Amino acid sequence: MANIKSQVKRIRTNEAARLRNQSVKSSLRTAIRSFREAAAAGDKDKANELLVATSRKLDKAASKGVIHANQAANKKSALAQAINKI
C-alpha cells in the first residue's frame, strides 16, 4: 500500500479505470463474436446490422483510449472483409 496521498488516490483512480476498460473490452469481444457468428451462418442482413453496431463500439473504445485507434481500424477492416466474403 502506498504511503503518499497522491499515490493512494491514483490507485483508486486506476482501479476504477481498469474496471471500466474491462467492461468496454468485454462488450467489444461480445459484439465481434456475435458478428462473426452471423457471418459464419451466412446471414448477410444481420451481419450488416451487427457490423455497424460493432464498428461504432470500436470507434467509441478508441476515442476513450481503451484500445489504440490503429487496432480499432484493423478490426473494422477485418470485419468488412469478412462481410464481403459472404
Curated annotation (Swiss-Prot):
Gene Ontology BP term (one): translation
Tagged with keyword Ribonucleoprotein: yes
InterPro entries for the chain: Ribosomal_bS20, Ribosomal_bS20_sf
A Pfam family per the record: Ribosomal_S20p
Gene3D superfamilies (alphabetical): Ribosomal protein S20
Swiss-Prot/TrEMBL keywords: Ribonucleoprotein, Ribosomal protein, RNA-binding, rRNA-binding
Domain of life: Bacteria
Molecular function GO labels: small ribosomal subunit rRNA binding; structural constituent of ribosome
GO cellular component assignments: cytosol; small ribosomal subunit
NCBIfam families hit by this protein: S20
Biological role stated in the UniProt entry: Binds directly to 16S ribosomal RNA.
Membership in a protein family: Belongs to the bacterial ribosomal protein bS20 family.
PANTHER family the record matches: 30S RIBOSOMAL PROTEIN S20 (PTHR33398), SMALL RIBOSOMAL SUBUNIT PROTEIN BS20C (PTHR33398:SF1)
Protein name stated in the entry: Small ribosomal subunit protein bS20
